[in-house]
Swiss-Prot record:
The bHLH domain, residue ranges: 24-90
Stored PROSITE patterns: BHLH
InterPro entries associated with the record: bHLH_dom, HLH_DNA-bd_sf, MASH1/Ascl1a-like
GO cellular-component term (any): transcription regulator complex
Region ranges (Disordered): 1-32
Species the sequence originates in: Drosophila melanogaster
Name this polypeptide is given: Achaete-scute complex protein T5
Keyword Cell wall biogenesis/degradation: no
Cysteines joined through disulfide linkages: none
GO molecular function: DNA binding; DNA-binding transcription factor activity; DNA-binding transcription factor activity, RNA polymerase II-specific; protein heterodimerization activity; RNA polymerase II transcription regulatory region sequence-specific DNA binding; sequence-specific DNA binding
A single GO BP: positive regulation of antibacterial peptide biosynthetic process
Biological role: AS-C proteins are involved in the determination of the neuronal precursors in the peripheral nervous system and the central nervous system.
Subunit structure: Efficient DNA binding requires dimerization with another bHLH protein.
Gene (name only): ac
Alphabetical UniProt keywords: Developmental protein, Differentiation, DNA-binding, Neurogenesis
Amino acid sequence: MALGSENHSVFNDDEESSSAFNGPSVIRRNARERNRVKQVNNGFSQLRQHIPAAVIADLSNGRRGIGPGANKKLSKVSTLKMAVEYIRRLQKVLHENDQQKQKQLHLQQQHLHFQQQQQHQHLYAWHQELQLQSPTGSTSSCNSISSYCKPATSTIPGATPPNNFHTKLEASFEDYRNNSCSSGTEDEDILDYISLWQDDL
């Protein structure tokens, strides 16, 4: 009788210890662990989907059955290695693209600088041409003509030309100086006026 009661007490102690081991805190901890493992597996699954098949085939050394749609999926370590390699290749493409853009920008700047130099040269040549064709030369020619005309009137002492003719001569000569004294035909006209005036004397 005492032995049976002792065995019953031992069985009850085992149940109490088992229930204590499977308590609510342990159950919650196990649930959190299962959820964490599930999230990690889902993350690796999504990461495998973003790795191009060409990168997987290149890094798997041509082994069959590996990659998207294959029977054998990538391990976590292989997935991380291929993701790192894929990121490295993307960085290389971006770097080459930036270099190409910088090269094109440099060529555009050189072309713009060349165009500005050409425009500056054209403007300088046009300015030089304008200086050669400026009214300064015609003014000096008018002054030389007027200096040439004045001695002609003073070479004949005591000569007194008619007033009307002298007025016409001054008006014609003034019009010649103001408008187009650089014309060769009007140079001949003024000389004809002088010759005519000398003949009348």
